[in-house]
């Protein structure tokens, strides 16, 4: 049998499917998620149910978002899970997660994310950070390193700044390729994202911060002077105490927010 087939389902490359099969890893992830009935539990990409089953057994209801119609059909027919699941068939990148919030309950979101959509999905989920209590995701290890990077690191970039603006980022565990079927060609890791109730560095307009980061990191080897010359003047850099000769990966989240707020103040 092909190593792309697991429990009778053939993994689809276009959906980035790699199914988690290591029981020890599954138990550790479920322990980190800490499922409970005081939150709306939401799984993105339940796949064949490796995380779905143990989480659903611990709560009254589990909401899942799955794109693959065949996997949705399997979940509808599952002898145990079918009565515990609320299933949304569709693309998580387009999904409005705010519709899942109920009074007095924030979301706990988790999933073994398809690696081909993990970064855009992170940016999409940040839009709902105020409705989310925790997020736990299996990601490509490289992405977890980017999420948790410090200024000056090669991995530090636009994703780092936006993730750390919205959330506290906590790497949980590393997962080797043989824990999946089919085995991915890269190492994986689980990360915990804890959205801030009060952001350490509030931004007056997060869209300005997004645009600033996109522009700054568009050419990583260039200096801030080159990349941001159309967004901030020499005098504004001096007022902020930021050295224009630095490269974008040398600038802290706090400094990016300060630059964005300077732009907002000028536009006001």
From Swiss-Prot:
Its main location: cytoplasm. One of its GO terms (molecular function) is RNA binding. S-adenosyl-L-methionine binds at residues 18, 20, 45, 66, 91, 112. It catalyses: adenosine(1518)/adenosine(1519) in 16S rRNA + 4 S-adenosyl-L-methionine = N(6)-dimethyladenosine(1518)/N(6)-dimethyladenosine(1519) in 16S rRNA + 4 S-adenosyl-L-homocysteine + 4 H(+). Keywords: Cytoplasm, Methyltransferase, RNA-binding, rRNA processing, S-adenosyl-L-methionine, Transferase. One of its GO terms (cellular component) is cytosol. Transmembrane segments: none annotated. Its EC number is 2.1.1.182. SMART domains: rADc (SM00650). It is found in: Cytoplasm. InterPro entries: KsgA/Erm, rRNA_Ade_diMease-like_C, rRNA_Ade_Mease_Trfase_CS, rRNA_Ade_methylase_Trfase_N, rRNA_adenine_dimethylase, SAM-dependent_MTases_sf. It comes from the Bacteria. Belongs to the class I-like SAM-binding methyltransferase superfamily. rRNA adenine N(6)-methyltransferase family. RsmA subfamily. Specifically dimethylates two adjacent adenosines (A1518 and A1519) in the loop of a conserved hairpin near the 3'-end of 16S rRNA in the 30S particle. May play a critical role in biogenesis of 30S subunits. This is Ribosomal RNA small subunit methyltransferase A. It comes from Shewanella sp. (strain W3-18-1). The gene is rsmA.
């Amino acid at each position: 049998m092909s190593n792309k087939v697991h429990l009778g389902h053939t993994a689809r490359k276009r959906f980035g499917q790699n199914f988690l099969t290591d029981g020890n890893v599954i138990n550790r992830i479920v322990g980190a998620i800490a499922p409970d009935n005081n939150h709306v539990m939401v799984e993105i990409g339940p796949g064949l149910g490796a995380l779905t089953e143990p989480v659903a057994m611990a709560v009254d209801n589990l909401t899942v978002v799955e794109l693959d119609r065949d996997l949705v059909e399997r979940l509808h027919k599952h002898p145990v899970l079918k009565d515990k699941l609320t299933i949304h068939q569709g693309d998580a990148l387009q999904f409005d997660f705010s519709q899942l919030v109920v009074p007095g309950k924030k979301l706990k979101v988790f999933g073994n994310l398809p690696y081909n959509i993990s970064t855009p999905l992170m940016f999409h989920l940040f839009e709902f950070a105020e409705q989310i209590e925790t997020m736990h995701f299996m990601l490509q290890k490289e992405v977890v390193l980017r999420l948790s990077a410090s200024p000056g690191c090669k991995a530090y970039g636009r994703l780092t700044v936006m993730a750390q603006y919205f959330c506290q980022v906590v790497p949980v565990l590393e997962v080797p390729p043989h824990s999946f079927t089919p085995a991915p060609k890269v190492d994986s890791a689980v990360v915990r994202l804890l959205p801030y109730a009060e952001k350490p560095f509030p931004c007056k307009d997060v869209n300005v911060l997004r645009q600033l980061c996109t522009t700054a990191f568009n050419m990583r080897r260039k200096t801030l002077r080159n990349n941001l010359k159309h967004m901030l003047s020499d005098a504004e850099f001096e007022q902020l105490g930021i050295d224009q000769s630095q490269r974008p990966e040398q600038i802290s989240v706090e400094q990016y927010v300060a630059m964005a707020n300077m732009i907002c103040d000028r536009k006001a």
